[in-house]
Amino acid sequence: MAVKGRENLIAKQWKHGLHKYIAGIIKGKEQKSIIVNGMPDHIHVFIGLKPSMAISDLVRDIKNNSSNFINEKKFVKGRFSWQEGYGAFSYGHSQIESVYDYILKQEEHHKKRMFREEYLDLL
């Protein structure tokens, strides 16, 4: 999920709180949060999704609730919102560890590549 306008609004001081909050949203929807991590302008959310849950519904709830959380806490000046849309990918059980490591090492990864390059490679 990307911040609206790709602005660098997710600050180090509160990003871990945001990640925990998003993991709580996922757990509250009875899904499995594997890892949440990201950069100042976007986040990656790795979820074990049950077949009964539509990814679009879960992403909508994550975006709505996390935007409200950020705005209520006044983490940013003005109004925070996520960009429209999202990218969703499915992975096999054998890929869980490599996807987890990829998301865990976002800061290191982005020292080498920009988000656009990263996203195009995932497609």
Locations of regions flagged by a protein language model:
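Basic nucleic-acid-binding interfaces
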Residues: 1-123
